[in-house]
């Protein structure tokens, strides 16, 4: 849209001429100052390094089989299996809690008749009765005594061909494997004090966490993995296990370089991306057997998660690109099921996820380099969608899946309800996965991809984990704003030129062709195309653009947006992060919502008119920060400005900044705004007029102030290019369909142009009145 020029001026109004800054500093200071801007481009798009760089891994990997350790005496950790692997018969291990429990384990070779053998247990030589009737299996025997000078009694046995046994301390008990392999299982025979019980082991051993009990079962019954038996694995001391493993700190801010004015900050962050798809399902008219469209739509999602103990508020926008159009036609009869178009994403498609959070990294995302990211993959599976037919069994679209794999990251801008946010755009390539999708009761089946009918499969969100790293150029002083050199003096000849130029601009309103104006208002005018028709400034576009931005920085519109942005930024960086982005945004919207009181407080129509007028003056900011495809007052004013700049004979490089700044404030002063709630439209004007009416009949209904207050906070605000009086006059004299009415209510540029080309006097008169308001 043409109003892109105003958005561009707002987002780039910080740009200044570096040489001017150096000259100004040198005039005030006696010391030499060197400004090195570094490898950054002063454009709307920061340079991006697509190299992955060095990516540290924040995952602490704990080995499943920890060992082998040398024979030793130590306090066995709670909730860990001690897997003992002796190589010969004899004493294997013993332990005690030093008060009322002594236990010992011995290993007996195969084919041993009942006999008494001597063992050294608890520092004493004792004789124990042992036996092993098996000719192939080794036998572990567990003995326990309850007194220091008591006698050991046999409690349990484990027969095994692998010469492996294991025990674990947990819940005040000792757990032990018993039975015969390959069907041995765990049990417990002893209650002890876990904190003070020590174990003395005469053989090599391993440690396994309790979470790997199933794996311990496998080792006991089937033996150790081959790598433990075929390689020369050297046992280490148990003291080596006391080394504390710490996670690498990946969420960090690093000062890369620093000068007097600027510093480069490297931000490394873990990231949790949550997103969901949105879709639109449109049913055709008729008997109810046909659907016109099933398509993907962009979807905003707000959520919170914890990063290094800090609660992060995040905002994502998910959109798709490169969709594939499919259709199904069951026949030509009105009762034949058909879908005119349904979208599917597959290998040639991309998914874009714009991510922003309230951390420090995103507050300084203006000039960025060395941007990289490392993300995992996610599988998105389609769910079922039933096509509700009036009669007969319902066809069901089901299945379909794609895998999203990271394909790069760049900078982007998210437009929230109140402000645009510098964010990261993660791009994902797609690969199709099982299952394919189909529509029951039709011949359509075996197609791969993810259809738009139910892409979320009734899950709350999809989640992707990973991390990103970037280097951002920020002011050295964290509280310092980027300096802007502003001129405070105006020469008398410049004021004279401006006076003459204003008169010429106002006279040129009669020479604007309405049809061409609508076409121009729908073009995305940028800085260059706006000024390309001015011959005297073509060779100095860069310098002139910088001067325009400097001047626009001081305009009322820029100041209002700046105040709104600052309040948004301050709220996002506050100590309390529990509120969502929408809740934070509502703080910035208080300038609008607090201007309206409850209907009980509106004593008279005059009071309501005063408050509605106050609200309407603030609605331009609300509309300005919400980008839509509909025509706005700023689109028309920018198109008028472009037309007059091309036609003017007195425009010059020195006068353009003032003219553009003035036009943003003075063009179309009598604006009217509209919000639509189902079949009811609320319309308010700068002059305090307000209407509520039905969109299908244009009959007025009572103006619900409380409902209006909620709508302007949560719903898009539209420019009322064709206001209520004009619409009612048009309907009374010419008659319009409901579709035409909705398109006029939404300021659809194509519909407006059709009425103008048909020389409709009511619409032409309304547009001409708006052009006449574009005065300086």
From Swiss-Prot:
Coiled-coil segments: 484-511
Placement of sequence motif YGL motif: 448-450
Q: Which domain of life is it from?
A: Viruses
The answer to whether keyword Membrane applies is yes
Keywords, comma-separated and alphabetical: Capsid protein, Coiled coil, Disulfide bond, Hemagglutinin, Host cell membrane, Host cytoplasm, Host cytoskeleton, Host endoplasmic reticulum, Host membrane, Host-virus interaction, Membrane, Outer capsid protein, Viral attachment to host cell, Viral penetration into host cytoplasm, Viral penetration via permeabilization of host membrane, Virion, Virus entry into host cell
- Give the region (Hydrophobic) as residue ranges: 389-409
Cystine bridges: 318-380
Query: Where in this protein does the record put region Spike body and stalk (antigen domain)?
Result: 248-479
**Where are the annotated segments for Spike foot?**
510-776
**Per the record, which residues fall in region Spike head?**
65-224
Q: Which GO terms describe its cellular component?
A: host cell endoplasmic reticulum-Golgi intermediate compartment; host cell plasma membrane; host cell rough endoplasmic reticulum; host cytoskeleton; membrane; viral outer capsid
Give the matching HAMAP family. Answer: Rota_A_VP4, Rota_VP4
Further remark: In group A rotaviruses, VP4 defines the P serotype.
Full protein name: Outer capsid protein VP4
* Protein species of origin: Rotavirus A (isolate RVA/Human/Belgium/B4106/2000/G3P11[14]) (RV-A)
């Amino acid at each position: 849209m043409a109003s892109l020029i105003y958005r561009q001026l707002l987002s780039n109004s910080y740009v200044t001429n570096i040489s001017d800054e150096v000259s100004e500093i040198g005039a005030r200071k006696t010391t030499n100052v060197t400004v090195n801007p570094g490898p950054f481009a002063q454009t709307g798009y920061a340079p991006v390094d697509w190299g992955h760089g060095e990516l540290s891994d924040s995952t602490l990997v704990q080995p499943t089989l920890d060992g082998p350790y040398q024979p030793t005496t130590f306090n066995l950790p709670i909730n860990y299996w001690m897997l003992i692997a002796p190589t010969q018969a004899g004493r294997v291990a013993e332990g005690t809690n030093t008060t009322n429990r002594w236990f010992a384990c011995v290993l007996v070779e195969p084919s041993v008749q009942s006999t008494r053998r001597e063992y050294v247990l608890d520092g004493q030589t004792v004789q124990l009765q042992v036996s092993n009737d098996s000719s192939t299996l080794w036998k572990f025997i567990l003995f326990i005594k309850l007194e220091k000078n008591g006698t050991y009694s046999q409690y349990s046995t484990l027969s095994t061909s692998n010469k492996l046994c294991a025990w674990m301390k947990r819940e005040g008990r000792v757990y032990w494997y018993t039975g015969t392999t390959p069907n041995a299982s765990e049990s417990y025979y002893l209650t002890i004090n876990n904190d003070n019980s020590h174990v003395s082991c005469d053989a090599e051993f391993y440690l396994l966490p309790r979470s790997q009990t199933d794996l311990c079962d496998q080792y006991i019954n089937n033996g150790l993995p081959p790598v433990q038996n075929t390689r020369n694995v050297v046992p280490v001391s148990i003291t080596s296990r006391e080394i504390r493993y710490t996670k690498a700190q990946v969420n960090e801010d690093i000062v890369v370089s620093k000068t007097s004015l600027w510093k480069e900050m490297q931000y490394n962050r873990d990231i949790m991306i949550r997103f969901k798809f949105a879709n639109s399902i449109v049913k055709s008219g008729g008997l109810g057997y046909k659907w016109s469209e099933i398509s993907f739509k962009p979807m905003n999602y707000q959520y919170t998660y914890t990063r290094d103990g800090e609660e992060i508020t995040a905002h994502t926008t998910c959109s798709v690109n490169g969709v594939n159009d499919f259709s199904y036609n069951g026949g030509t009869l009105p009762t034949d099921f058909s879908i005119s178009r349904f979208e599917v994403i597959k290998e040639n498609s991309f998914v874009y996820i714009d991510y922003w959070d309230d951390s420090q990294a995103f507050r300084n995302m203006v000039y960025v380099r060395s941007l990289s990211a490392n993300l995992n993959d996610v599988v998105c599976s389609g769910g079922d969608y039933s096509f509700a037919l009036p009669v007969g069994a319902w066809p069901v679209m089901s299945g379909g899946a794609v895998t999203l794999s990271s394909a790069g990251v760049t900078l982007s801008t998210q437009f929230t309800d109140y402000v645009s946010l510098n964010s990261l755009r993660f791009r994902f390539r797609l690969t199709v996965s099982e299952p394919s999708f189909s529509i029951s009761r039709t011949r359509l089946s075996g197609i791969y991809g993810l259809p738009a009918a139910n892409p979320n499969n009734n899950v709350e969100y999809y989640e992707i984990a990973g991390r990103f790293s970037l280097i951002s150029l920020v002011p050295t002083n964290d509280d310092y704003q980027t300096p802007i050199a502003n001129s405070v003096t105006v020469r008398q000849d410049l004021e004279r030129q401006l006076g003459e130029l204003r008169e010429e601009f106002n006279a040129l309103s009669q020479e604007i062709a309405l049809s061409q104006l609508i076409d121009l208002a729908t073009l995305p005018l940028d800085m260059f195309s706006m000024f390309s028709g001015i011959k005297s400034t073509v060779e100095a576009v860069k310098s002139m653009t910088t001067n325009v931005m400097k001047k626009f920085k001081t305009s009322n519109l820029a100041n209002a947006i700046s105040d709104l942005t600052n309040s948004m930024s301050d709220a996002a960086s506050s100590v309390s992060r529990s509120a969502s982005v929408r809740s934070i945004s509502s703080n910035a919207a208080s300038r609008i919502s607090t201007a309206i009181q409850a209907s009980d407080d509106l004593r008279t129509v005059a009071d309501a008119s005063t408050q509605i007028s106050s609200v309407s003056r603030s609605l331009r900011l609300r509309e300005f920060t919400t980008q839509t495809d509909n025509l706005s007052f700023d689109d028309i004013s920018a198109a008028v400005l472009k037309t007059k700049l091309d036609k003017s004979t007195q425009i010059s490089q020195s006068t353009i900044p003032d003219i553009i700044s003035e036009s943003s404030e003075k063009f179309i002063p009598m604006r009217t705004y509209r919000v639509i709630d189902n079949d009811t439209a609320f319309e308010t004007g700068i002059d305090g007029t307000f209407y509520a009416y039905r969109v299908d009949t244009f009959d007025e209904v009572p103006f619900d102030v409380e409902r209006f207050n909620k709508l302007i906070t949560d719903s898009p605000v539209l420019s009322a290019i064709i206001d209520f009086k004009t619409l009612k006059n048009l309907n009374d004299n010419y008659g319009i369909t409901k579709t035409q009415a909705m398109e006029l209510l939404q300021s659809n540029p194509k519909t407006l142009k059709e009425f103008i080309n048909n020389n409709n006097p009511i619409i032409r008169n309304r547009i001409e009145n708006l052009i006449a308001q574009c005065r300086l």
